[in-house]
Amino acid sequence: MATHTRWVGVKGHGTDFNGKSIKTSDCGQLADAALYATHPSMFDQGVDGKKFDGLANNVGQVRFGGDCYAYGLLALGHVDLVVEAKLQFYDFMALIPVVEGAGGVTSDWQGDRLGRTSDGHMLAAANETLRDLVLNHLCV
């Protein structure tokens, strides 16, 4: 391992980081939340861009970069939200047990479960409260 970091998430079990159990944050307000996305170009200038911008204007902090590392940071409790678009199922399927095993929740932008036929929109949140607040912005 180049970075000597390893997340292990197994459905039905907790998530470990380098052998230690981890948990997502208990952040319950958008104004306090740290939001990550890989790159602004994921969100087109149309509907996706407007939805993301509306959300980004209501969170405490927005950062770009990190790719899958952002989901690991979410599982560790250092990031509260990861919102992305234009993903393929192989981009997110391995991340779901890592996030959910640490207490987080994942869905598409409509709140539906992710799978092979998902449309490429992903939301990962530290908890259900944050997820519901985000969906109020993305489901308009």
PLM regions and their residue ranges:
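Acidic beta-strand-loop-alpha-helix segment within the catalytic core
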Residues: M1-Y71, D119-V140
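Short secondary-structure boundary segments
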Residues: H39, A85-L87, Q110-D112
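A generic structural-conservation signal
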Residues: F64-G65, V83, D108
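Hydrophobic residues within well-ordered alpha-helices
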Residues: G72-A75, M93-G101
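Alpha-to-beta junction loops
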Residues: L76-L81, G104-V105
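Short, hinge-like loop/turn segments at secondary-structure boundaries
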Residues: L81, E100-G101, A125-A126
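Acidic donor-binding loop at a coil-to-helix junction in glycosyltransferase catalytic cores
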Residues: Y90
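Acidic, metal-binding active-site segment of PIN/NYN-like and related structure-specific nucleases
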Residues: G103-D119
